[in-house]
Amino acid sequence: MRLHESLSPIVHVLSLSCFFLSVSLAHERALFSGTLNDSETIVSSFRTFRFGFFSPVNSTNRYAGIWYNSIPVQTVIWVANKDTPINDSSGVISISEDGNLVVTDGQRRVLWSTNVSTRASANSTVAELLESGNLVLKDANTDAYLWESFKYPTDSWLPNMLVGTNARTGGGNITITSWTNPSDPSPGSYTAALVLAPYPELFIFNNNDNNATVWRSGPWNGLMFNGLPDVYPGLFLYRFKVNDDTNGSATMSYANDSTLRHLYLDYRGFAIRRDWSEARRNWTLGSQVPATECDIYSRCGQYTTCNPRKNPHCSCIKGFRPRNLIEWNNGNWSGGCIRKLPLQCERQNNKGSADRFLKLQRMKMPDFARRSEASEPECFMTCLQSCSCIAFAHGLGYGCMIWNRSLVDSQVLSASGMDLSIRLAHSEFKTQDRRPILIGTSLAGGIFVVATCVLLARRIVMKKRAKKKGTDAEQIFKRVEALAGGSREKLKELPLFEFQVLATATDNFSLSNKLGQGGFGPVYKGMLLEGQEIAVKRLSQASGQGLEELVTEVVVISKLQHRNLVKLFGCCIAGEERMLVYEFMPKKSLDFYIFDPREAKLLDWNTRFEIINGICRGLLYLHRDSRLRIIHRDLKASNILLDENLIPKISDFGLARIFPGNEDEANTRRVVGTYGYMAPEYAMGGLFSEKSDVFSLGVILLEIISGRRNSHSTLLAHVWSIWNEGEINGMVDPEIFDQLFEKEIRKCVHIALLCVQDAANDRPSVSTVCMMLSSEVADIPEPKQPAFMPRNVGLEAEFSESIALKASINNVTITDVSGR
C-alpha cells in the first residue's frame, strides 16, 4: 500500500510527460491529409527532413519544398512550384478534391499539382514525408504510392533515388537540373542525366548551349565509371543495373551514413558533394566534378590527351600534330590535332608495312565507342582488319570497345584507367632510322642560313625606316635610350611595325574590327599575315597621350614578362600616327563581364577568385619581383584583360612610373588616373606610391565581388555600411553568392576594405594581400573606415569629378586634372 502511494506521484508525472510528448509528436507529424498554410510544416519520422514553405537566400518569394531539418544552414533538396513562386505568405498546400497534392496561392489558383490520374478522392489519399527525403502521395487504404518526389527530382540526388530510365517510371527519363541561381530554384542552365547506349555513362549538359556536353563520367563496367577511378563501390554509387528492356537506372548510397552528405548540381554546372561539419556548423566541400580542366568535356579537342598533372595540360597523341599551331601555342587547344602520316590502309597502293597500334595506359576512354562482345585477340583483329577503326580497348565488364570516329575527351588518370590502343602508320614506330639525324642536321643548317638572311634584311630595313621616318624614329629612340638607361640594345627585340602592315591587319581600321574606345584612343582587332591575332591601340591626337606616354609603355612592357601582364608585340611611329601592338585578348576586359547582368553569370565565384589572385600576382610582380619597380597609376577593371582561359592580364602602362630602388613614393603636379580608383592622397595631393595602386586594387576587388561600379565612392560607403552590420549578403553579386563560399567571399571583402583605407600607411602591401588571400588562418586586422572622397577639395578635384561623370560609363582615363 505504501509502495503504491509512494509511486503514485511519479506515475502521475510520467503520465503527464507522455501526454505532452504525444501532443508534441502529433504536432510534428510526418503525413497529412488536409492543408498546410505558410507557417505549417511536416517532418520525417526521425526529423531529418521537413516539408513546407521556404524562401531562398536573398529572395522573398515563397516555395513549397523539402529541406534538411537538423542543421542550421538552409539546404533545400526538392522544390514543388519552382517555376511559379508565391510573392506573399498566402500559399496553401493541400489535398484537392480529386486526391492530388496541390500548391495554391491566396486567390486559390493552382500553381503546382502532382497531376495524378486517379479515381481517388480527397478523403482517400494522404501525403507523407519519408525519412529518406522522399515525399509520397499514397492511397490511405492500401498504402500504394500514387506519386513520389524521387521520380521528379530538382537539383539534388539523394541516396536510393533513381536517375535514368526504368520500367517503374513508365519509361520516362529522370534527370537532375540545377537552379537558375541560389535565389531562384527555377530550372537553370545545367542538367545531369544517365545515358545508356552503348555504355551507361553520367553526363552534365549545358541547356543554354544546345545541350552541349560539359562533363562525362566515362563508361560503367558494372563496378565503377571509368572516368571516376577513385570512386569505389559503396562510397559513391552503391548499385547500378541495366534492365533487359534496355532501360537502366543509377542509384546512389554512401558507405558511411553517420555523416550528413548532400550531392547536388549547382547553378554553375558542378556536381558537388558536400559534407556537414558539426565542428564548423557548416557544409564542407567533399568533392566535385568537373574538378580539373581535364574533366571539362573535350578540353583539348580531338586526338589529344589531357593530363592535369602536366603544364600545359594538353598534348597531341604520338603521330598527330596541332591542327592550328599558332592557336595551340597560344593555349587555345579546342582545334585539337590531326594525323601526321596517312595510314597504310588508306593508301591506294598496298606497298609498305601494315599499320601498328600505340598503347596508351591509365586512360579515361574517349567518347563515342562502339560495343562488341569479342575477346581481346578478336578485338585487335577486328580493328586491324577495318580501316575505319582508329582505336580499340578491351577490359573486364566493358568487352571490346571500338572507335570509328575522332577520339575526343581522353584523359590520363592518376590511378586505374584502361589501356587504349591507337592506330598509327608503321613509319611512326621506326626509331632506328638515320633519316631523322640527317634531317635534323640539314634543318639546323637551314635555320642558320635563314636566320643570317633575316638579320641582314632587318638591318637593311631598319636603315630604310630611319631614312623614311627621319625625325620621328630618331626622337622615339632618344626617349627610349633615356628611359632604358642609355642603351638601345635592351629594346632590339621589340619590332617597329610599318603603318601599312597594321592597316592591312585591321582592314584599314574598319568599324567591324573595333574592339572598344579607351581613354587614349580606339583599339582594333587585327591579324598579321602569318595568322597571329593582335590588338592595335591607335592613339588619338586629342587623347593627351603623346610620345612620352607611348615611350613609357614601350619601355615598361618590353622589360616585363609575367603570366598576368599583357604582352606587347611592338609599336608604330609614322608621321602623326602612334600605335601600340599587343597580344589579342579574346575574352575582352573584366568590366565587360562584372558590370553586365547578362555576362556576369559567366564568371562564377571560383573564376572570380582566380581573377583576383591573378591581378594580385601581376601587381606584386610590378612592385617587387620585376627588374624595375613600377607604379601602374591607372589600375581599373577595364584595364584588366582576359585571355581565352579567363586568366587576367594587367594592361595599359601609358601612365606607369618607374621607381628608383631607393624611393618609396613620389609627387606630381600632373594627376592622372580614373576617378573612383584613385587613392585620396594621389587625387588631392599628387602623392603616389605602391599603396596608391593597392587602393585601386581594393576598389577592383569590391567591384568583382559586388558587380557594381564605384561611382563617386558610393560603393565603398555601401560596403562599409553593410560590413558594420555583420552581413555581406547585401553587397555580393547574386550570380556568385553561395553559402558554400561565403567564408571565402567574406575574407575577400575584408581584404578589400583594408586596401581602401584612408591613410596609405594603413593599407597592406600587395605581398601581404597575396599572403592573406592564400592563407586559411591569416590574422587579418579589422579595417578602418574607407576613404570616401569629399566633395569640396578644390577646383582641380572638381574638374576631375566632372570628367569622371562623363567617364564613368565609358571608363575613360583622366589624363590631367589641371585644364589643358
From Swiss-Prot:
Residues 458-820 are cytoplasmic. One of its GO terms (biological process) is recognition of pollen. Its EC number is 2.7.11.1. ATP binds at residues 515-523, 537. It is an enzyme of class 2 (transferase). Keywords: ATP-binding, Cell membrane, Disulfide bond, EGF-like domain, Glycoprotein, Kinase, Lectin, Membrane, Nucleotide-binding, Receptor, Serine/threonine-protein kinase, Signal, Transferase, Transmembrane, Transmembrane helix. It comes from the Eukaryota. GO terms for molecular function: ATP binding; calmodulin binding; carbohydrate binding; protein serine kinase activity; protein serine/threonine kinase activity; ubiquitin protein ligase binding. Residues 345-425 form the PAN domain. This is G-type lectin S-receptor-like serine/threonine-protein kinase At1g11303. It comes from Arabidopsis thaliana. The lineage of its organism: Eukaryota, Viridiplantae, Streptophyta, Embryophyta, Tracheophyta.
